[in-house]
Amino acid sequence: MPPAALQATVSESVKDAIISKLRQPPSAVPSREWSAETRTSLTPADAGIAEARASAEDIELVDLQHHNFSEPRKRIVSPASLSRFEHSQAFAEILAFICVCNTRVVGKTLTEEIQISSACRTILEMLDQVAALRESTPPDASIGSSRFGNPAFRTFYAKIRENTDRLHRMIPGLETDSEWSRAARAELSVYFQECWGNEKRIDYGSGMELNMACWLLCLCKLRILRLPEDGACIVLRIFWTYVQVMRDIQSSYWLEPAGSHGVWGLDDYHFLPFLWGAGQLSSHRHLRPKAIHDAEIVDEFAPKYMYLACIQFINSVKTASLRWHSPMLDDISGAKSWSKVNQGMIKMYRAEVLKKLPIAQHIFFGSLLRFPEPATGELEEEDVEEDAHGHIHPAGKPHAHGTGEGQAAGWGDCCGIPIPSAFAAAEQEKKRQQGNFSSTMLGEKPFGTGVRRIPFD
C-alpha cells in the first residue's frame, strides 16, 4: 500500500521554530481574500444554503433485499440534461454526502484513532487488493519517450474488471448468489470500475474521483456504510487510502490529467482531498491557510492533514513556488481562516464539478442514483455508446477530434485541455539530462532523489 503521506524527518529545533511561527498573531502576515475571479466562480446566488442544511436525512435509504436494481449508464449528454441533473434528488444526495462527511472530519487528523466498522474494514481490504493488482502490473517499458499514458494501464484496468465482482462479494450482505445480491453487485461495480481512470484515454480526473464518491454514497444508501456514524472513517481511512492508491497508479502509468485546467486548477487529478482537508483544519487553533507556503510547517503536518499532504505532494513534483505552478492554491491561501476555505471549496465543487458538463458527463445513473424523468412534453435525449475518445454525446452530434494517442489527439471542449502527465514530463527531463532510461519504467517511484521536478505543466 502506498504510504499515507510523504514523510519528512523534522528535528526538535525545527519543531520549536514551527511552534513559534504558529503562535504569531494572524496580523503578523498580511492576509487577503480570494480574488474576484475566484469569488465569482464560488458564490452563485443560491450557493451555501443547501450546503449548510445538508444532513444524512437527505439521503434516501433502500432495502437491499427488496430493491429493484438496474445497471447504471451515463445520462448527462448536453446542457439540457445537465440542467435536469442540477434539480434532481441525485444531485442533492451527492452534495449531502460530501457535506455530511465534511462535518465528520472537522478537528480530526489522519493519524488519530477513529471507529472503524466491519464494513469499513472490508472496503479497506478491497483497496489493498487493488493496490496489489497495480503492483503485479508493471508499466510497459517499450513505449520509450512517450509523455502520455502508459498502455499497461489498460492491462491493469482489465484486471480490475475481472476482479470487481469477486471484490464486491467481500462486502457483508453481498456475498451470496441470490438474485438481489447479484443485481446489487452489478450496479455497484459500475461505479467501482469507473473510479480508477478511463481505459481508452488513459487519464484520470475529478469525474473519476466523483465516481468513487458515488460508489461510497451507494453503499450508504444500501445501509452497508452508515452516515453520519461512518463519516470520519469514509474520509480519513477509505477515501484517503483510495487517493494513495490513485497516486501510485497515476505515477506508475503516467495517467493524463482529464479535463485539467492546468495551472488554473487545484490539482492535476483531485479535488475532494482539498475540500475535506480544509474541513479537517477548519477548527484548528493555530494553523492558517497561509501556512501552505512554509515548507517546514507543511512537512510537519502533512501526515495529519490531507490538504497539507496534497500541497507536499504537489511540491514534490513541481519546482518554483505555488504562486507560479498553482496560482489558485496560492490565491486561496490568502483567506482569513480554514473555515472560509472549506466553505469556498464546497461552493466551488458544486459550481465547477457537479455543474460542469465535462465532469458531470462521467456520472452514472441507475436505481440508486436516479436520473430525473423528463417533464411533460420534454423529449428524452438519446445517448450513444462512448466513442473513440471515451465520451458520449447526443445521438448524431459528435464533434471532431485529431489523430493521435490519448489526449495527444487534442479533444474538443467537452474533453478538456490536452496535458501530458507531470510524472512523465519529470521523467523525460531526467532522461534528457542523464541520458539513461526512465526509472519509473524499471519499477521505481518517481519521487526519489534522482527525479528532477518540473516547473509546472
UniProtKB/Swiss-Prot annotation:
Region described as Disordered: spans on this chain: 387-407, 426-457
- Compartment list: Cytoplasm
What EC class is this?
isomerase
List the GO cellular component terms: cytoplasm; nucleus; protein phosphatase type 2A complex
Q: What is its EC number?
A: 5.2.1.8
Task: State where composition is biased (Basic residues).
Answer: 391-400
Record's keyword terms, sorted: Cytoplasm, Isomerase, Rotamase
Q: Which Gene3D superfamilies match?
A: 1.20.120.1150
Task: Please indicate if the UniProt record lists Methyltransferase as a keyword.
Answer: no
Record's keyword annotation contains Isomerase? yes
Q: Name one GO molecular function term.
A: protein tyrosine phosphatase activator activity
BP-aspect Gene Ontology terms: mitotic spindle organization; response to osmotic stress
Q: Which reaction does it catalyse?
A: [protein]-peptidylproline (omega=180) = [protein]-peptidylproline (omega=0)
> Which Pfam family is one of this chain's hits?
PTPA
Q: Which domain of life is it from?
A: Eukaryota
Q: Which InterPro entries match?
A: Phstyr_phstse_ac, PTPA_C_lid, PTPA_sf
Main role?
Answer: PPIases accelerate the folding of proteins. It catalyzes the cis-trans isomerization of proline imidic peptide bonds in oligopeptides. Acts as a regulatory subunit for PP2A-like phosphatases modulating their activity or substrate specificity, probably by inducing a conformational change in the catalytic subunit, a direct target of the PPIase. Can reactivate inactive phosphatase PP2A-phosphatase methylesterase complexes (PP2Ai) in presence of ATP and Mg(2+) by dissociating the inactive form from the complex.
Would you identify the family this protein belongs to, as annotated? Belongs to the PTPA-type PPIase family.
Q: What is this protein called?
A: Serine/threonine-protein phosphatase 2A activator 2
The gene that this protein is the product of is RRD2
